[in-house]
Amino acid sequence: MELTIWKVPTSKQNPAGVRYRLAFVRRGESAPAVLYDNHHPKGHHRHIEGVEEPYAFVDVDGLLQDFVEHVRKITGDAAWPRR
């Protein structure tokens, strides 16, 4: 798993002032099963089981909640992540 969130200056490309890449990769696989990112020029989007779709970014808290929700769905583990 990789969770990277950068605070960046607000700009036309990045009005929220945030860049991010959140990835969950299953053991023994190389491609992420869940990936949220907002690289240029695509902007906010996510990949769930290899299917890319737009993502409606609101704030970092919502981003983290949505990411955890998708990982829980694909792993079937309602307690993920364990502390």
Residue locations for each model-derived region?
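Generic detection of intrinsically disordered/low-complexity segments and helix-coil linkers/edges
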Residues: 14, 18, 30, 49-51, ...
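Beta-strand-rich cores of mature extracytoplasmic or soluble domains
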Residues: 43-48, 53
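Short, compact, well-ordered microdomains
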Residues: 51-82
